[in-house]
């Protein structure tokens, strides 16, 4: 237990170090800084960042331990999964629903974070031993069905993501819409429903691209995949950011956390059933 805690602590430090390095590099490039709705108390922000980093490290450690392949394979799979969500998809979402800005800076910073934490995770936590390469696992994965079957199933997964998003997001929208309509806490509503559909379709493609390498390298049961992937998705797609958004009231963050948890678990189980 003590050894595990020590490893998680080191992974958290690597995440923080990657964030700091990415932030300094982004600043040196002169990228636009985010404009938070109120001045940040850096001490409080640091506490929340450290706590959220621990959660990310714990989630990724469990994910990495279920992956087959060598360390380089697991590093690439984990780093891409983290960056696809924390560097790309979350930035797209923030651009649509917030006025904070700084999405390019965040994308660059998250690249450093993703590489740093993924490196620490695969060095400190062993994966499942596998005598095959990722390329052979990839061929085996897609050999299970015909091209027509894969086309249909992948299309359903891409379409399912926006549907899941709206199923759980619409009830939450009824609860928190006033905050978005009044531009409270740096929030805003998208310009139109059509724009929102387009954005979620783009995010759906990145979500699938982030999940496929994990499915290929996965060496546990499908049931375990549904839970492990779903919880990891919850962490990287929302919990990490919501834990640090301390300027928002707890009620708002809690409602969105429940929404994202249901989104993520449902999407994880859809992947399990369809792919």
Name these PLM-found stretches:
Residues 1-275:
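Juxtamembrane/disordered regions of integral membrane proteins
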């Amino acid at each position: 237990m003590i050894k595990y805690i020590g490893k998680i602590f080191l992974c958290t430090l690597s995440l923080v170090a990657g964030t700091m390095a990415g932030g300094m590099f982004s600043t040196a490039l002169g990228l636009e800084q985010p404009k938070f709705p109120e001045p940040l108390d850096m001490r409080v922000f640091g506490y929340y960042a450290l706590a959220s980093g621990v959660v990310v490290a714990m989630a990724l450690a469990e994910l990495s331990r279920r992956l087959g392949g060598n360390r380089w394979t697991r590093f690439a799979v984990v780093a891409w999964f983290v960056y696809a969500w924390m560097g790309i998809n979350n930035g797209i979402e923030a651009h649509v629903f917030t006025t904070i800005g700084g999405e390019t800076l965040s994308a660059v910073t998250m690249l450093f974070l993703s590489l740093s934490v993924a490196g620490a995770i695969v060095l400190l936590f062993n994966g499942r031993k596998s005598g095959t390469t990722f390329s052979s696992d990839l061929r085996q994965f897609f050999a299970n069905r015909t091209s027509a079957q894969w086309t249909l199933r992948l299309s359903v997964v891409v379409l399912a993501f926006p549907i899941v998003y709206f199923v759980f997001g619409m009830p939450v929208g009824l609860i928190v819409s006033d905050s978005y309509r009044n531009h409270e806490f740096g929030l805003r509503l998208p310009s139109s429903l059509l724009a929102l559909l387009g954005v979620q379709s783009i995010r759906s493609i990145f979500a699938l691209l982030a999940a496929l390498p994990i499915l290929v390298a996965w060496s546990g049961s499908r049931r375990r995949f549904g839970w492990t992937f779903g919880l990891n998705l919850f962490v990287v797609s929302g919990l990490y950011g919501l834990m640090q958004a301390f300027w928002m009231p707890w009620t708002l963050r809690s409602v969105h956390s429940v929404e994202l948890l249901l989104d993520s678990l449902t999407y994880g189980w859809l992947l399990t059933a369809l792919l």
